[in-house]
Amino acid sequence: MKKSYIIVFLLLFLNCSLLKADDSIDLPKTMVWSTYGLASSSYPEASAFADALMKNYNVRVRLKPSGTGIGRLLPLKKKRVSIAFLGSESFFASEGIYDFAARNWGPQNLRVILARPNTFGIAVPANTDIYKIADLKGKRVAYTTANPSVNVKVEAIMSFADLTWDDVTKTVFPAFTASVKALQTGKVDAVGAVPSGPGVYELAASKKGIRWLDMPKTNTEAWNKLQNIIPFMHPEVETLGAGLSKDNSVELGGYRYPTLTVYADTSEETVYNFIKAIDLSYELFKNITPVMYRWKLDLAVGTPVDAPIHKGTIKYLKEKNLWSEEDEKWNNQRIERLNTLLDGWEKFLEKNIDLTDEDFTSKWLEERKILLAKFLK
């Protein structure tokens, strides 16, 4: 009996210790996050995070879905949400391009908290004569209207072989799903896609099969060209996705999606407590979807990424010995690049206030190229 009391006491003591450790994480009791729409692959991930915070820390999270980058970022800018689950718009916004080249936007001083590793590549049917990126010359390559996230990645990958949209037959589609279906029906020869994304599994399962065009890490010259267009992409070996496995891997473009994003003025302690809470809740959500394991801390941090990493994240990573000198160097250079754009934008606004919206955007994009010339590889 005495032994039983001792065991119960120890269990209670350990439980209290755990609660005390949990109490050291200071989070608001309610949070609102902007996310991709309900049908997206990232919405269930945001939902899993929210459930974990509720179970572990009694934090109620409301998700605010939107199908557009502006719709996800504007609430963050207006401080109606505390965190935005973004895609490549975190890069576009920090750079002041595409939708964010307008005079009411411009470069945004964003910071990344966490970002899941992902890959992107160009897929072709396996029964074609397209084996490498250079073989795309003269072929029909999908271009999706109003989807710069996909299009700029395809453009960057084509630069691997010194190709541009002028060297291929740009085949325009109204939506990404339509372009993937067209690949299956033979109406287009190549599509940029995520290996674990919608549609590509159907192609892999068909008689045509699927082939991913290799992007060898050893081709540093080609990677430099690519990173001049999208500096957040890096070489990555992919084993997960349509037609892929550990025994049939391919080197693709690594990037991060979704990126949990805030503005730079978000407090260090707020971000520190959030990332710590997510890290300590990993066991609760790691099996929710096939890719959730990639939110493990040592995978979901690091560089390169779409925008500089927040100082609160860096503080926690240093405690976990997950922040390297290379990461520090990259982050400092990325902040320098962003500050160059922020300063340049303010000067540009003062000088060009009377321009029409169309001329304003066009002239800003020219100015941006000049500002960033010193960062080209």
For the regions a language model picked out, list residue spans one by one:
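Positively charged n-region of N-terminal signal peptides that target proteins for export
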Residues: 1-4
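Bacterial N-terminal signal peptides
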Residues: 7-15
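Sec/Tat signal peptide C-region and signal peptidase I cleavage site
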Residues: 17-21
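Bilobed "Venus flytrap"/periplasmic-binding protein-like clamshell domains
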Residues: 26-56, 60-62, 119-185, 196-198, ...
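An extracytoplasmic/periplasmic, membrane-proximal ligand-sensing/linker region
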Residues: 28, 195-208, 212, 269-271, ...
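Pocket-flanking alpha-helical
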Residues: 45-52, 62-104, 122, 130, ...
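Pocket-lining segment of extracytoplasmic ligand-binding domains
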Residues: 88-90, 98-100, 128, 165-167, ...
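Ligand-binding clefts/hinges and TM-proximal coupling segments of bilobed small-molecule sensing domains
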Residues: 140-156, 232-301, 305
